[in-house]
C-alpha cells in the first residue's frame, strides 16, 4: 500500500514530533516499515468465543458460506478474514449470538500473556470495550472471577453489553476510578491486566485523520502521569507472586520502556519473558536501562496487526509500599 501512497507523503501527513520520535527510537528501515503499516488497510480479524463455540465448527461454517480465512500461527482460536469486512461479519448469526468476537490480533496478546487459569481472581483495570475482558473469561473456561473496571460511563455500558453478549457470567463490571481500585481491593487478585489508556500511535492509519489528529507531545507526557498512577493501583491490588501485564497500543518510549524502568525502580517487581512468537514483534529497547526490559515486546503495525507493546511483571513477596515518585 505504501507503493501507492509514498513514504514521503505518509510522513507529511503525520505529526512532525511523532515522526521525529520514530527516527530517534528505530533504524530508518524499521521506521519505513512502520509507515508502510500505517498505510495498510488492515484485514478483519476475530477470535472464537470458546464459551459458546469452537474453532473447528467456525472454520467449517466459514467454508460453507465461502468466507476465506487464514489461521494465526501463535493462537489457534483466532482467524484472519480474507474476503469479508467487519460489517459483513456483523450480519452473521454467529456474531449476533456471541459465538465470535471481532478483535485485532494485537489486542489478543495481553490476555494470552496474562495466562489466566480456572478459579483465579483477575482484574482488568481499564476494561472497555471488553475485548480483553471477555477473552480472559473464555481462557478461564468461565470458572473463577473477573473484575472489569471502566471509568467512562458510556464505555462502561458498552462493556456491560459485550460481557453479556459473550456469556461471560464470571465478570463483574464496575464504573470506578482505576487509580483507586488498589486501595479498594488490596492484594485481592492473582493476576492483573493493565491495558492502559495511551496515545494510540499503534492504531494510526492514513485513512482516518482522527486517529492521529489530536496527538501531541503534551498528550504523551500527560498520559505517562496517569499510567504511573494506574500502575501503582494495579500493583497494590495484586497478590504477592502475582502477574501484572502492562500493555499499550502505542509505539513511543515514554509510555513503554520508560514506564517499565520507573516500575522496576519503584516497585517490588521483576520482568518475565513473553513466550509468544509473533513475526511482527521486536524486543523492547533497554539501552541505558535495566537489561530485563528487552523481555517486553513491541509489535509493529502491519496489514494484520496494530502496533502494540506488551510486558509481564511478577510481584515480589513483601507487602505493598507507598510510592510517591509519580512525576
Language-model region placement:
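S-adenosylmethionine
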Residues: 1-327
Amino acid at each position: 500500500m505504501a507503493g501507492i501512497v509514498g513514504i514521503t507523503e505518509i510522513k507529511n501527513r503525520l505529526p512532525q514530533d511523532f515522526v521525529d520520535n520514530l527516527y530517534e527510537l528505530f533504524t530508518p528501515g524499521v521506521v519505513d516499515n512502520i509507515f508502510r503499516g500505517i498505510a495498510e488497510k488492515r484485514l478483519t480479524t476475530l477470535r472464537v468465543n470458546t464459551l459458546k463455540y469452537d474453532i473447528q465448527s467456525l472454520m467449517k461454517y466459514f467454508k460453507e458460506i465461502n468466507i476465506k480465512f487464514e489461521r494465526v500461527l501463535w493462537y489457534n482460536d483466532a482467524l484472519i478474514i480474507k474476503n469479508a469486512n467487519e460489517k459483513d461479519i456483523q450480519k452473521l448469526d454467529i456474531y449476533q449470538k456471541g459465538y465470535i468476537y471481532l478483535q485485532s490480533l494485537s489486542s489478543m496478546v495481553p490476555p494470552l500473556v496474562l495466562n489466566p487459569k480456572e478459579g483465579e481472581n483477575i482484574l482488568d483495570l481499564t476494561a472497555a470495550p471488553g475485548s480483553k475482558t471477555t477473552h480472559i473469561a473464555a481462557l478461564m473456561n468461565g470458572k473463577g472471577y473477573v473484575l472489569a473496571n471502566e471509568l467512562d460511563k458510556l464505555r462502561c455500558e458498552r462493556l456491560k453489553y459485550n460481557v453479556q453478549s459473550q456469556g461471560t457470567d464470571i465478570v463483574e463490571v464496575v464504573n470506578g476510578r482505576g487509580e483507586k481500585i488498589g486501595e479498594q481491593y488490596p492484594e485481592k487478585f492473582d493476576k492483573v491486566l493493565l491495558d492502559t489508556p495511551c496515545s494510540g500511535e499503534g492504531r494510526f492509519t492514513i485513512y482516518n485523520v482522527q486517529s492521529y489528529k489530536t496527538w501531541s507531545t503534551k498528550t504523551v507526557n500527560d498520559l505517562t502521569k496517569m499510567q504511573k498512577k494506574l500502575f501503582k493501583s494495579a500493583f497494590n491490588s495484586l497478590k504477592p507472586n502475582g502477574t501484572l501485564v502492562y500493555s499499550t497500543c502505542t509505539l513511543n518510549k515514554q509510555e513503554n520502556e520508560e514506564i517499565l524502568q520507573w516500575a522496576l525502580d519503584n516497585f517490588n517487581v521483576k520482568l518475565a519473558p513473553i513466550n509468544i512468537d509473533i513475526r511482527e514483534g521486536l524486543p523492547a529497547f533497554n539501552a541505558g536501562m535495566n537489561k530485563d526490559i528487552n523481555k517486553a515486546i513491541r509489535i509493529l503495525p502491519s496489514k494484520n496487526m496494530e502496533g502494540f507493546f506488551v510486558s509481564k511483571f511478577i510481584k515480589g513477596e513483601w507487602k505493598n509500599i507507598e510510592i510517591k515518585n509519580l512525576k
